[in-house]
Amino acid sequence: MPSMYGLPAFVSATELLLAVTVFCLGFWVVRATRTWVPKGLKTPPGPWGLPFIGHMLTVGKNPHLSLTRLSQQYGDVLQIRIGSTPVVVLSGLNTIKQALVRQGDDFKGRPDLYSFTLITNGKSMTFNPDSGPVWAARRRLAQNALKSFSIASDPTSASSCYLEEHVSKEANYLVSKLQKVMAEVGHFDPYKYLVVSVANVICAICFGQRYDHDDQELLSIVNLSNEFGEVTGSGYPADFIPVLRYLPNSSLDAFKDLNDKFYSFMKKLIKEHYRTFEKGHIRDITDSLIEHCQDRKLDENANVQLSDDKVITIVLDLFGAGFDTVTTAISWSLMYLVTNPRVQRKIQEELDTVIGRDRQPRLSDRPQLPYLEAFILETFRHSSFVPFTIPHSTTRDTSLNGFYIPKGCCVFVNQWQVNHDRELWGDPNEFRPERFLTPSGTLDKRLSEKVTLFGLGKRKCIGETIGRSEVFLFLAILLQQIEFKVSPGEKVDMTPTYGLTLKHARCEHFQVQMRSSGPQHLQA
């Protein structure tokens, strides 16, 4: 007979056992996924996720946008789940600085993601989860090698440093190449030629050699790097849902294949360097690392050996730090120049006033060219083409803004949100280089430091200084000599596509013309 509450009066033992089992399983799942939080702290807030996939649908194809919207609702420290993995998302400049700079030791780790283990056989200095003394010593070595063969001066050259020499050579070649293409075809895709010029600069620094633009070896490097960015752009759910690693996955297979090709290619180049190496005659970064490898010690303060494999992985990390970011930065710059001709004219007027046409721009001219610097900063900010840093992880239990974050927690840092924060910029969607200038026309250093693109703290991009200098000099030399525009009636698509870096649609309708006055062949 029915009970007074409309439920059956009698329940079978099987039904009762099933109900208890379901309740216990549910209780266990809740307990297992719930983190113990110390007294006085809170768990980071966030939306409810779906079983198994967590917030993967919420994050979607444009994580920088969806996570920015969530930060407006939940604050600068929020938590989502990708699969069953909790991920803390940091937004807001002050919060990110607090985590990565003031609490840098707490947040300097890398998560042990499956895809990271596939990059240079899991030995990459950039992606490896190691953040101890060995990692720190290798990072110092890489920084010193990069500085020696870029910022250091070449006594046999008229240029102020190796970087200036290599960039000047490539920028001038690029001007000639674009003129030739214009004469033959009448329009072009600048990325096609720019990417080879930038690759040549980092090849000269890493391997001591420059390639012709149609050299198959150089083109293979460029193609591999482009494919790497395209493949990684799709992301890897297998990083957060382990069972997917054992299922057919074309993207993951392509990622493995690309890493194997890149590693083999670099290994071949470095093997040739070992064959021709002469102690005391250091030609490039690879030679410098080989010398340290043979000395078997990174520095006098670290009893750490440098194996032959580590030489390959460090060179790969340096190549990556100096290639895709610079190419993407200059490519976006050209897009903003053709869509903002007034800005292009102002840059060229500044170049004419400060430098003239009788000599080429040099790195030492940077302080005297504030409008060009402001344009570059606004390109970095508005495009935010590195929307997130490489994921961080916590090295120990810690807290941030009153929220508890346990050891080993994966942390996303939303740089795009910082660069589009209305509280910082007022009109973040407007492209306006003048925002970085003071009333007297000088660069506003306080505001320029708020642009976030290369990360912060102990995992900051080691190629930042080189990259900024390279972007400046390429643009200064190009804009001194030529004017960029698009074919009449053609529109430029500035919509970014999400990936390792945000890429705009390729445009095949660029045109250039030599500027109307001044000599075409300038003194370096």
UniProtKB/Swiss-Prot annotation:
It is a peripheral membrane protein. Its main location: endoplasmic reticulum. One of its GO terms (cellular component) is mitochondrial inner membrane. It is found in: Endoplasmic reticulum membrane; Mitochondrion inner membrane; Microsome membrane; Cytoplasm. Its cofactor is heme. Residues 33-44 are annotated as: Mitochondrial targeting signal. Pathway: Steroid hormone biosynthesis; Lipid metabolism; fatty acid metabolism; Cofactor metabolism; retinol metabolism. GO terms for molecular function: arachidonate monooxygenase activity; demethylase activity; enzyme binding; estrogen 16-alpha-hydroxylase activity; estrogen 2-hydroxylase activity; flavonoid 3'-monooxygenase activity; heme binding; Hsp70 protein binding. Induction: By 3-methylcholanthrene (3MC). This is Cytochrome P450 1A1. It comes from Mus musculus (Mouse).
